[in-house]
């Protein structure tokens, strides 16, 4: 009834319920303006809904859909509009950042911290969307649309969660001077696509992103004119979300008072929109952790396998021997290599008769953000 009431000019959808897509579509079809915090609807149905809003002369605003109280959507659409966005690195999910912060502090393992996060209300009873990385992927798809003119949904970009991160990974990262965070990354590729991916990554411990703690979010954008811009704040919660929703409502009211036209046009992508690139074409540094038999020639074979796929080793650390099992833990850090080659090499290493279990692979991002010293 509200949607078709002639006295209603703006429909605000904050339910997060499954029918939300239908309600938003119906409201736009009726010529209403819509404000929503529903990232899934915007990420998965944006093409259709933005085109519909433009056709019907309405508007669709969604500041609260990404990073809660951080005004990242409006900053990209207006404040940074004169820039070509070169890259974006972000911590976009408060639940996983809270969990990784606690695990990094040594306050428990994955299962313990997840249970604590659920008890405190930071994680849903079913935490899959958060811990799998899909929540961050949907947010990155939205940011990719605005910042990079990229077309695609959260399901179209590479997504890996934190479910398999172990305390031993965190300790190994610390010894190397790194901290593990769930990162959302987007950047241009040489062939006109957009490299967009969400996964755990090792970032230098002195970097700003490594020092974003608990449920807070942060986004670093490199613009062609402004250089590095860092946005930081509460990524979720009742009041930050309400702040973003009200800001959208105020913007709509200001437009109506001034007679300004809808601003939806920049969200409707044309034939020149860039697709998301395949992660297998990405060139990244890698951390590998494996347990192998303690015998001569093992490291030489592993080195040869990596070399066969044109993967260069930056450093190797061998831990003390497990006296009971007769195995040792090897940690290998590589120089930049193509993801496709790395996956092939890891599969070959895991197939060797002296390798025990699966090799742990974590991507490394050294060029993420300025250090704390540079910020100060």
Residue ranges and their predicted role:
Residues 1-20:
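A structured beta-alpha segment of the ubiquitous adenosine-cofactor-binding alpha/beta core
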Residues 17-30, 39-78:
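Rossmann-fold NAD(P)-binding glycine/threonine-rich loop
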Residues 33-35, 313:
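A short hydrophobic/small-residue beta-strand
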Residues 54-135, 142:
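Rossmann-like NAD(P)H-binding beta-loop-alpha module
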Residues 112-211, 216-218, 237:
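Substrate-binding/catalytic subdomain of NAD(P)-dependent oxidoreductase enzymes
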Residues 199-224, 238-239, 307-324:
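Low-complexity, glycine/alanine/valine/leucine- and proline-rich hydrophobic stretches
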Residues 227-229, 233-239:
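Glycine-rich phosphate/pyrophosphate-binding beta-alpha loops
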Residues 244, 249-376:
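A conserved regulatory-domain signal marking ACT and ACT-like small-molecule sensing domains
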